Amino acid sequence: MTQLPSQMADRWQGMLYWHILLGRSPQVRALASMAQDRLAGFSGLHFTPKRWLHVTTLTVGFIEEFTETDIGNMVAHAKRLLNDTPPARVTLGKVLYHPEAIALKVEPAGALDQVREAVRAAATNGEAKQHESWIPHITLAYSTSVQPAEPIIATLGRRLPPYDISVDCVNLVVQEGAERLWNWRSIAKVFLGSSSKRKM
């Protein structure tokens, strides 16, 4: 921050993401409730609202950079790419710890790679982008203060009871404002394979 800016920017302008939304899954909600109940005694943790439990699949960019036509084309492209991709069976239960968050790992590794590659191709119109490592996860709590991690790990543990779930769709989501406001809205849903016949 050594140079003066020519103009100020909106820190909280809307962002566009592809998310796998899992807030309606009874299994995911049960695991989140179990973890959040165990961690309720700790300050400095911000819990993900159950409605918005999710797997972040791709950060697309600022919403103002996309026209309605751009978004429509991206969604249509994603639908074509995922039309032959069957719903993915994944297992939740292993707890991941990061200095800034506590999450559930999505296993097995690679189970959702086809979904990510499809939405990435749709967002870039097929242009190649540098490969980025991706560990699919569901964040249960975000850290909002500095505190020792060991008591938190000892209380929650390294693994919760395993649950198997089916991932059958991915959502294009607009996030408005500061992250912790959870001012989200889904503007498109793309089903995987034969699940496209289900009601939206």
Describe the residue ranges of each PLM region.
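Histidine-dependent nucleotide/RNA phosphoesterase domain, centered on the 2H-phosphoesterase fold
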Residues: 1-200
